[in-house]
């Protein structure tokens, strides 16, 4: 048992999916997993373990933003020995050729968060995904005929941004999309020597205003979850 997770030892699998929304964690468990048990309800941040294609997998809500996901990733690794962590969530596209419903796999993540500068004063640490997980997820996506993009994303500390100037500059440098957690996940995975990946669906385009319908979001979300689960059980 840790501060924010009430699971007993052995109740959490070595491979885990990390949606921000705890209700998405519940949806994933109920829709994709078999023999499901709920191991956590502290602060309503639900966690479940079950099997997918006969292999144990867990799913844990993390909340939104760098501070929140950092809490859960630290505890999952340090207290429960989790080895493979895959964030599943949504993002906003900032490239013209990235469309809503595309799947983005984050190879790395730049950020406006000060998280890493507190650890590396005067340096810009560049956290990266685990290549084996990335390749497995990419292959799973392309086999399903999905439009999968691999590249850099922005992990933002601010959701309601007053100025988009920096986001536009990052787009000029090839950043694909904006989300709020990947930098923290990849940095902590590097610190503890475990494997991490972010698989994201494009829910909207920040510059064009294009958005997905709720039905489109759910369909694309399901495809993303299958990609993540297929990668997780092969690791």
From Swiss-Prot:
<keyword id="KW-0808">Transferase</keyword>
<protein>
    <recommendedName>
        <fullName>Purine nucleoside phosphorylase DeoD-type</fullName>
        <ecNumber>2.4.2.1</ecNumber>
    </recommendedName>
</protein>
<comment type="function">
    <text>Catalyzes the reversible phosphorolytic breakdown of the N-glycosidic bond in the beta-(deoxy)ribonucleoside molecules, with the formation of the corresponding free purine bases and pentose-1-phosphate.</text>
</comment>
<dbReference type="InterPro" id="IPR035994">
    <property type="entry name" value="Nucleoside_phosphorylase_sf"/>
</dbReference>
<dbReference type="GO" id="GO:0006152">
    <property type="term" value="P:purine nucleoside catabolic process"/>
</dbReference>
<feature type="binding site" description="in other chain">
    <location>
        <position position="20"/>
    </location>
    <ligand>
        <name>phosphate</name>
    </ligand>
</feature>
<feature type="active site" description="Proton donor">
    <location>
        <position position="204"/>
    </location>
</feature>
<feature type="binding site" description="in other chain">
    <location>
        <begin position="87"/>
        <end position="90"/>
    </location>
    <ligand>
        <name>phosphate</name>
    </ligand>
</feature>
<feature type="binding site" description="in other chain">
    <location>
        <position position="24"/>
    </location>
    <ligand>
        <name>phosphate</name>
    </ligand>
</feature>
<keyword id="KW-0328">Glycosyltransferase</keyword>
<feature type="binding site" description="in other chain">
    <location>
        <begin position="203"/>
        <end position="204"/>
    </location>
    <ligand>
        <name>a purine D-ribonucleoside</name>
    </ligand>
</feature>
<feature type="site" description="Important for catalytic activity">
    <location>
        <position position="217"/>
    </location>
</feature>
<feature type="binding site">
    <location>
        <position position="43"/>
    </location>
    <ligand>
        <name>phosphate</name>
    </ligand>
</feature>
<dbReference type="InterPro" id="IPR004402">
    <property type="entry name" value="DeoD-type"/>
</dbReference>
<comment type="similarity">
    <text>Belongs to the PNP/UDP phosphorylase family.</text>
</comment>
<dbReference type="GO" id="GO:0004731">
    <property type="term" value="F:purine-nucleoside phosphorylase activity"/>
</dbReference>
<feature type="binding site" description="in other chain">
    <location>
        <position position="162"/>
    </location>
    <ligand>
        <name>a purine D-ribonucleoside</name>
    </ligand>
</feature>
<dbReference type="GO" id="GO:0005829">
    <property type="term" value="C:cytosol"/>
</dbReference>
<dbReference type="InterPro" id="IPR018016">
    <property type="entry name" value="Nucleoside_phosphorylase_CS"/>
</dbReference>
<dbReference type="Pfam" id="PF01048">
    <property type="entry name" value="PNP_UDP_1"/>
</dbReference>
<comment type="subunit">
    <text>Homohexamer; trimer of homodimers.</text>
</comment>
<feature type="binding site" description="in other chain">
    <location>
        <begin position="179"/>
        <end position="181"/>
    </location>
    <ligand>
        <name>a purine D-ribonucleoside</name>
    </ligand>
</feature>
<dbReference type="InterPro" id="IPR000845">
    <property type="entry name" value="Nucleoside_phosphorylase_d"/>
</dbReference>
<feature type="binding site">
    <location>
        <position position="4"/>
    </location>
    <ligand>
        <name>a purine D-ribonucleoside</name>
    </ligand>
</feature>
């Amino acid at each position: 048992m840790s501060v924010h997770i009430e699971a007993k030892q052995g109740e959490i699998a070595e491979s885990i999916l990390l949606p921000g929304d705890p209700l998405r964690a519940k949806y994933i468990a109920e829709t994709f997993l078999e023999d499901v048990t709920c191991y956590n309800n502290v602060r309503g941040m639900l966690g479940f373990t079950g099997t997918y294609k006969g292999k144990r997998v867990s799913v844990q809500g993390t909340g939104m933003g760098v501070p929140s996901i950092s809490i859960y990733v630290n505890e999952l690794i340090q207290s429960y020995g989790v080895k493979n962590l895959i964030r599943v969530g949504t993002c906003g596209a900032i490239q013209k050729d990235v469309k809503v419903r595309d799947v983005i796999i984050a190879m790395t993540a730049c950020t406006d968060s000060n998280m890493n500068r507190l650890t590396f004063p005067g340096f810009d640490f560049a956290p990266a995904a685990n290549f084996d997980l990335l390749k497995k997820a990419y292959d799973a996506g392309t086999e399903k005929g999905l439009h999968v993009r691999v590249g850099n994303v922005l992990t933002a500390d601010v959701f309601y941004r007053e100025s988009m100037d920096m986001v536009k500059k990052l787009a000029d440098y090839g950043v694909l999309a904006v989300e709020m957690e990947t930098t923290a996940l990849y940095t902590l995975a590097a610190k503890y020597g475990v494997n991490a990946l972010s698989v994201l669906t494009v829910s909207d385009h920040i510059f064009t205003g294009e958005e997905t319908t709720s039905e489109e979001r759910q369909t694309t979300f399901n495809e993303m979850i299958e990609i993540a689960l297929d990668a997780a059980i092969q690791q």
